[in-house]
């Protein structure tokens, strides 16, 4: 997500963003609420006097509208967030319209009060767009390219070449050593790695990688490509390997937290689930990590429940808040447990 304008007085005001990924659309589903004023460029029928005489001639024109949101739907498989509401700014004020927010859409969101988790979501999404979550190595005998996968495209980090001695073990290992050394400097701690290329060089390299950097190599997977360089990177993207990695990394983090929660619950240990038990634990200052399902957060706000007060109190007590996606299994499990739970600093009796 790219923030293009931020104009806040305290917690009131406007933030303008560009949605760059499907994840950004998912974030926006939980940032935008009923009652927000949202501006974006859209298409709407331009009704002139002649159009009304011959309605078959009515054409849609591009206009910038501001609507007061009264309903929103995230269509995951259509890659679209739909915002429905009454037009307050632009043409046909007082009529209803639906804004289709897609990847690449620019929009402005105006709120009377921005909540902590909404601002944090924007910050997290903005930071995620700047750092690579996946590093790719396209390698063949004597040649390797390292690239970063960003939301806006692929950035070539380095090219390593060994022009001769490909059959000499010492020189080949020296080439592999140089690639590994570049990766030590290039790979952020949370990033995954794709090793790609034609032939068997990539398999030989991954063995060397596992021997010299086992922790980093454990995050790597292998993909076949017909060539190296930018064309090889594009092959990896077309096959969907990067999308799978980025989705799986989130699922893995949320799965680990759910495993911790289930284990503590089964031991009658340092865990609480359900709103009542979580509030009780919070009163004792015991909440270390609050787990809340995105649907529970949205439903609570729509019903007027002060769920945000609970989130603020956890943060004020130096606790961490993790919002789970119910689009994935860990989030579904959490939702079935009441949508809210906590890992505790110490055991609390109910």
Swiss-Prot record:
It comes from the Archaea. Pfam families: eRF1_1 (PF03463), eRF1_2 (PF03464), eRF1_3 (PF03465). Its cofactor is a divalent metal cation. Its EC number is 3.1.-.-. GO terms for molecular function: endonuclease activity; metal ion binding. Belongs to the eukaryotic release factor 1 family. Pelota subfamily. One of its GO terms (cellular component) is cytoplasm. One of its GO terms (biological process) is nuclear-transcribed mRNA catabolic process, non-stop decay. The N-terminal domain has the RNA-binding Sm fold. It harbors the endoribonuclease activity. This is Protein pelota homolog. It is found in: Cytoplasm. Monomer. Keywords: Cytoplasm, Endonuclease, Hydrolase, Metal-binding, Nuclease. May function in recognizing stalled ribosomes, interact with stem-loop structures in stalled mRNA molecules, and effect endonucleolytic cleavage of the mRNA. May play a role in the release non-functional ribosomes and degradation of damaged mRNAs. Has endoribonuclease activity. It comes from Methanosarcina barkeri (strain Fusaro / DSM 804). Its main location: cytoplasm. InterPro entries: eFR1_2_sf, eRF1_1_Pelota, eRF1_2, eRF1_3, Pelota/DOM34_N, Pelota_arc, Ribosomal_eL30-like_sf, Transl-rel_pelota.
């Amino acid at each position: 997500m790219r923030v293009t304008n931020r104009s806040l007085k305290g917690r009131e005001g406007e933030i303008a963003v560009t949605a760059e990924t499907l994840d950004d659309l998912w974030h926006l589903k939980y940032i935008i609420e009923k009652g927000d004023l949202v501006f974006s460029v859209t298409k709407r029928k331009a009704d002139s006097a002649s159009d009304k005489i011959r309605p078959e001639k009515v054409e849609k024109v591009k206009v910038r509208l501001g609507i007061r949101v009264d309903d929103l739907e995230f269509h995951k498989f259509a890659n679209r967030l739909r915002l429905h509401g009454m037009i307050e700014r632009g043409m046909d004020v007082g009529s209803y319209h639906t804004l289709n927010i897609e990847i690449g859409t620019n929009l402005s969101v105006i709120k009377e009060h921005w909540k902590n988790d909404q601002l944090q979501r924007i910050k997290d999404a903005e930071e995620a767009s700047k750092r690579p979550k996946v590093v790719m190595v396209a390698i063949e005998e004597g040649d390797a390219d390292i690239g970063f996968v960003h939301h806006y495209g692929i950035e070539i980090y380095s090219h390593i070449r060994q022009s001769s001695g490909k059959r000499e073990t010492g020189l080949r290992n020296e080439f592999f050593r140089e690639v590994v050394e570049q990766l030590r400097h290039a790979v952020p701690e949370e990033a995954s790695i794709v090793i790609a290329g034609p032939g068997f060089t990539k398999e030989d390299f991954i063995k060397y990688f596992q021997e010299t950097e086992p922790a980093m190599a454990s995050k790597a997977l292998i993909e076949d490509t017909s060539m190296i360089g930018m064309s090889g990177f594009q092959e990896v993207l077309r096959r969907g390997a990067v999308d799978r990695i980025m989705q799986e990394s989130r699922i893995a983090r949320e799965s680990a937290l759910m495993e911790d929660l289930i284990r503590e619950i089964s031991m009658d240990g340092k865990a609480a689930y359900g709103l009542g038990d979580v509030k009780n634990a919070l009163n004792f200052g015991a909440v270390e990590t609050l787990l809340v399902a995105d649907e529970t957060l949205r439903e609570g706000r729509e019903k007027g429940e002060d769920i945000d007060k609970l989130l603020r109190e956890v943060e004020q007590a130096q606790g961490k808040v993790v919002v789970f996606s119910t689009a994935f299994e860990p989030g579904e499990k959490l939702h079935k447990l009441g949508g809210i739970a906590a890992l505790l600093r110490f055991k609390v009796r109910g």
